[in-house]
Amino acid sequence: LDHPGLILADAGDTLEHYFRKIGKPFDQLTFTPDADGVIPVLDREWFEDDIVARTRDFLRATFGVGTLEENVRFIEESLGKDLRKYFMTDFYKDHLQTYKKRPIYWLFQSQKKGFSALIYLHRYTRDTVNVLLNGYLRDFLHKLHSRIEHLEHVQATSESAREKTAARKESDALKKTLRECEEYEREIILPLAQQRIELDLDDGVKVNYLKFGKALATIPGLAAKEED
């Protein structure tokens, strides 16, 4: 919005690179890239800078606040579902199809999709997984613990049978998500963060993507022996 063409296209590009290329001070920018390059994709608004919030920010900056809800409604009607459901279920499949299974956005995702977050390949650095771990995944685990504690308090104190039932169902579901994400953190993300993997974009998406194993969403056929 502030400069024609693709701005962040070199390996390890940061916001500092963006500001230098744009040539404008921060307070004059129409829209800025995500500060840390990690965007949560979750089933509800657990984070203020999740993908739905960032999408709304982009629409607001592009078309104005006065038409924000109208534009969101138009997009959701075109998609046949709300923005959050689209990003949770269809966005990455569409992205893989567009880029022929060589994505420029990578989806970190636990086994049963309890936790998901997108990164942009060209903004990846050796510390990106640490940012995801300490800035998002562990914070998400803390939020899950807090929500479960609240729901258990509701079950213990509420006089409404309906409220107790709803709290129990949500609590049971969140406990499953918590166990899944704790395993993802312990067995997969923490070891990767400690490795501080470096990428060579000249090797191609396939070679680099496979370095992250089960940390990333599976791309059918990517690991097969085929020409890159």
Regions inferred by a protein language model and the residue ranges of each:
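Terminal accessory regions of large proteins
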Residues: 1-228
